[in-house]
C-alpha cells in the first residue's frame, strides 16, 4: 500500500539521521521496520552496510570506545536528576525499582496478572516516577524500566518469550557500574514517554518533555508551554483534517472509478452470442455474423448502421489476422523442433494444424480484392 511505502521512507530517513548521530541501534531498528513495511533496495543496502560495519567494529577497541561514551552520558543524566529537590520516599522507591530482577517485580504484580492489573499498576507507578514529578537520582531510569516492563508484559508474544527466561538476568548479565541495563532482548516497540502519553493524554501541565527509547535512542529534555483544553481541541480538529487530506486521493479514485463504470455503456454488438445480445445479423459487405439486442433496429439504421458494420468488420478481420499469426507461429515452431530432434511425431502434429483462421483470412482478402 502507498501508506506503507510513505511510512517506510520515513523510517529510512530516521535511520539515516540516527547513523549521523552515531546511534547504530536506532538506525538498524528503523531500517528493519522499513523493510517490513515496504521492502526496498535502499533500506536493504543500508541495513546490510550497517551489519557489516558492526561486524568489523566489534573488537576490543570499539567496546572500549562504547564504554567511554556511555559513562559521560550516564553522568549527565544522573546530574539532571540530582539538580532538583526530592524526598527520601522517592529515593527509596527508585532503589526498589533498581533492585527488581523481573518485570513482574517492577510493576508489583503476580506472574498471572491480567491486562487490567497491569494497567492499574502501570498508571500508579508511572505517575509516581515520571521525571517531571520525581527528581530523585535514578528516577529517569526507573521510569524507563517501568515503561519497558509494562510494554513487554502487555504484549502477549513478548510476555510469552519473556516468561521462558524467568528473569532479566537470564537474558543478558551485563550490568554496567551498578546501573540499569536495557539491552536485554526484551525491549518495547514504544518509548516510555509515548506510552505515558497514551495513558494520560500528555505530560504534566508544568513539566518538561522527556524522550526515551530503552537505551537505543538518546535522552532529550526540553521545556514546553502547557496546552490548554482549547489547544487540544484544535489539535484534534487538525488531526481529523489531516486524516481527511490523506484519504482524499483514495476517495477521488473511488469516485472516478464509479463514474467511469456508470458512463461506459456496453457495445451495441458482439461477435458471439451472449446475454442480452442473441439476435443474429450479418454485415452487408463481408458477410460477418454478429449479435445484437432486440432494440437494435430502432437505434441503428442508415449511415449509422453502415458505420457500425464497418467497425464490426474491422474488429473481426483484426481478430482473424491475430489468430492466423498464432497458427503459423505454432506450426513453424513444431516443424523446426521436428527437424532439430528428427521427431516424426512433431512433424505430423504440425501438419495436422487446420489453419482455419488463415483460411478465413485468405477468404476475406479475396473479398477485398473483389474475387
Swiss-Prot record:
Task: Point to the regions of Basic residues compositional bias.
Answer: 218-229
Q: Which residues lie on this side of the membrane: Cytoplasmic?
A: 1-238
InterPro entries, A to Z: DnaJ_domain (IPR001623), DnaJ_domain_CS (IPR018253), DnaJ_subfamily_B/C (IPR051100), DUF1977_DnaJ-like (IPR015399), J_dom_sf (IPR036869), TPR_rpt (IPR019734)
Read off the SMART domains from this record. DnaJ (SM00271)
Could you tell me which residues belong to the region Disordered?
A: 48-92, 215-235
Name the membrane topology term: Single-pass membrane protein
List all membrane-crossing ranges: 239-259
Q: Where are the TPR repeats?
A: 8-41
| GO CC terms in record | endoplasmic reticulum; endoplasmic reticulum membrane
Q: Which residues lie on this side of the membrane: Lumenal?
A: 260-371
Q: Which domain of life is it from?
A: Eukaryota
Alphabetized PANTHER family for the sequence:
AT29763P-RELATED, DNAJ HOMOLOG SUBFAMILY B MEMBER 14
Q: What family is it from?
A: Belongs to the DnaJ family. DNAJB12/DNAJB14 subfamily.
Function (record text): Acts as a co-chaperone with HSPA8/Hsc70; required to promote protein folding and trafficking, prevent aggregation of client proteins, and promote unfolded proteins to endoplasmic reticulum-associated degradation (ERAD) pathway. Acts by determining hspa8/Hsc70's ATPase and polypeptide-binding activities. Can also act independently of hspa8/Hsc70: together with dnajb12, acts as a chaperone that promotes maturation of potassium channels by stabilizing nascent channel subunits and assembling them into tetramers.
Q: What is this protein called?
A: DnaJ homolog subfamily B member 14
Q: Which organism is it from?
A: Xenopus laevis
Query: Could you tell me the gene encoding this protein?
Result: dnajb14
Amino acid at each position: 500500500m502507498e501508506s506503507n511505502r510513505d511510512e517506510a521512507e520515513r523510517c529510512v530517513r530516521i535511520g539515516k539521521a540516527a547513523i549521523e548521530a552515531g546511534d547504530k541501534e536506532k538506525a538498524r531498528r528503523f531500517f528493519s521496520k522499513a523493510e517490513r513495511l515496504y521492502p526496498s533496495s535502499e533500506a536493504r543496502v543500508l541495513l546490510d552496510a550497517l551489519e557489516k560495519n558492526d561486524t568489523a567494529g566489534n573488537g576490543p577497541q570499539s567496546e572500549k570506545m562504547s564504554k567511554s561514551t556511555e559513562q559521560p552520558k550516564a553522568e549527565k543524566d544522573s546530574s539532571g536528576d540530582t539538580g532538583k529537590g526530592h524526598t527520601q520516599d522517592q529515593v527509596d522507591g527508585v532503589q526498589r525499582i533498581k533492585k527488581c530482577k523481573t518485570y513482574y517485580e517492577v510493576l508489583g504484580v503476580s506472574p498471572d496478572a491480567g491486562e487490567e492489573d497491569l494497567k492499574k499498576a502501570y498508571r500508579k507507578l508511572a505517575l509516581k516516577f515520571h521525571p517531571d514529578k520525581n527528581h530523585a537520582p535514578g528516577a529517569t531510569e526507573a521510569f524507563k524500566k517501568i515503561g519497558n516492563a509494562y510494554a513487554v508484559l502487555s504484549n502477549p508474544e513478548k510476555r510469552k518469550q519473556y516468561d521462558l527466561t524467568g528473569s532479566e538476568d537470564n537474558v543478558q548479565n551485563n550490568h554496567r557500574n551498578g546501573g540499569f541495563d536495557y539491552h536485554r532482548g526484551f525491549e518495547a516497540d514504544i518509548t516510555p514517554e509515548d506510552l505515558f502519553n497514551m495513558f494520560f493524554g500528555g505530560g504534566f501541565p508544568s513539566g518538561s518533555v522527556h524522550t526515551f527509547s530503552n537505551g537505543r535512542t538518546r535522552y532529550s529534555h526540553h521545556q514546553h508551554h502547557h496546552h490548554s483544553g482549547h489547544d487540544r481541541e484544535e489539535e484534534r480538529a487538525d488531526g481529523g483534517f489531516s486524516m481527511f487530506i490523506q484519504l482524499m486521493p483514495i476517495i477521488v479514485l473511488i469516485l472516478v472509478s464509479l463514474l467511469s463504470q456508470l458512463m461506459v455503456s456496453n457495445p451495441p454488438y458482439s461477435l458471439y452470442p451472449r446475454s442480452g445480445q442473441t439476435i443474429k445479423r450479418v454485415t452487408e459487405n463481408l458477410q460477418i455474423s454478429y449479435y445484437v439486442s432486440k432494440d437494435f433496429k430502432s437505434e441503428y439504421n442508415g449511415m449509422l448502421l453502415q458505420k457500425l458494420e464497418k467497425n464490426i468488420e474491422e474488429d473481426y478481420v483484426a481478430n482473424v489476422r491475430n489468430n492466423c499469426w498464432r497458427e503459423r507461429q505454432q506450426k513453424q515452431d513444431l516443424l523446426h523442433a521436428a527437424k532439430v530432434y528428427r521427431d516424426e511425431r512433431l512433424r505430423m502434429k504440425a501438419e495436422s494444424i487446420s489453419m482455419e483462421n488463415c483460411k478465413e483470412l485468405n477468404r476475406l482478402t479475396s473479398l477485398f480484392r473483389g474475387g
